[in-house]
Amino acid sequence: MEHYVYWVSTALLSLLYLTSAVMYITKRNWVRQALGELGYPGYLVSILAAVKLLAVAVILSRLHVALSDLAYAGMFFHLMLAAGAHIGVHKAKEAVPAFIGLVLLSVSFLTQNAARDIRSPYAPSAVTHLVAAITPDKV
């Protein structure tokens, strides 16, 4: 069951980030304007698009656990800052995707050791056992 939870949450998180990166590339001017309204410089569009694509590639390929964990950390800070920026300019409804991303990120990170051969030292097995305890037996 934990394998499914991991892969579904990771796939949805990846889809969120890939969709966002494609939008940053295809609707560059609109995204620059939106970032400007949040108080960020326009040159971040290209950087964020590249980093989002790289983060997804690193997490899905998991060539190196430390890089994968670093990608999770980067996504965490990005999503927290995105939510905070939207709330800071009184556009809380626009922070909903960031909060959804945080939930998906948390589930993906906390269940990764159950689904991956090489374990992350930062996602303790106790968390995996907790997830196992609250999910129904062999569905």
Name what the model sees in each region.
Residues 1-139:
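Membrane-interface extramembranous regions
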